[in-house]
Design a protein with these regions (language model features):
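Short helix-loop-beta connector
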Residues: 9-12
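Conserved N-terminal/central alpha/beta ligand/cofactor-binding core
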Residues: 4-6, 41-158
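A generic local structural motif
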Residues: 1-5, 24
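N-terminal Rossmann-like FAD-binding beta1-loop-alpha1 element of flavoenzymes
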Residues: 14-39
Length: 158
């Protein structure tokens, strides 16, 4: 086909996303605000690795915590294997990511006295409570909510 004859713009074509875990569903839900999305998964839609994650999501949410403390904890716990700029990026963006999940209905365990009303835990290597969780099945809770939202979105085909 002659490229000059192609009148279809890339913006009018659906975006194909491979994978139905946290990353794939997040991208799909955001892109579906303005275009059609197709999600493909090699196994069943409920069989992503996201659903198996138990612990929680780390974030700088408490005013007593800081990005610098989070980065320091991550680098120290990483025994020389952590790229500091990557750890810093994650620490800087973590609160926004957790806010997005909360805004999308993820049922994190709550604590009225906790930062943003969330119950935070402290796990190995962390100097502050900074792990938001949904009981002991955080990944499952996140995956179920985002998958249900994707199934309900008319711009997303699964």
């Amino acid at each position: 086909m002659n490229p000059k004859q192609n009148t279809t713009s890339a913006e009018s074509l659906p975006v194909v996303i491979i994978g139905a875990g946290l990353a794939g569903l997040t991208v799909a839900l955001e892109l579906a605000k303005s275009r059609e999305v197709i999600i493909m998964a090699k196994r069943g839609l409920s069989e992503s690795a996201t659903a198996w994650a138990q612990g929680g999501i780390v974030g700088v949410l408490d005013e007593k915590d800081s990005v610098d403390a989070h980065v320091r904890d991550t680098v120290d716990a990483g025994a020389g294997l952590v790229v500091e700029s990557t750890a810093r990026y994650i620490a800087e963006e973590s609160a926004k990511a957790i806010d997005w999940l909360v805004d999308n209905g993820v049922p994190f365990t709550t604590d009225p006295a906790g930062p943003k009303g969330l119950h935070l835990t402290r796990e190995g290597g962390h100097s502050h409570r900074r792990i938001a969780h949904a009981a002991d099945a955080t990944g499952k809770a996140i995956h179920e909510v985002l998958l249900d939202k994707a199934k309900a979105n008319p711009n997303i085909k699964l």
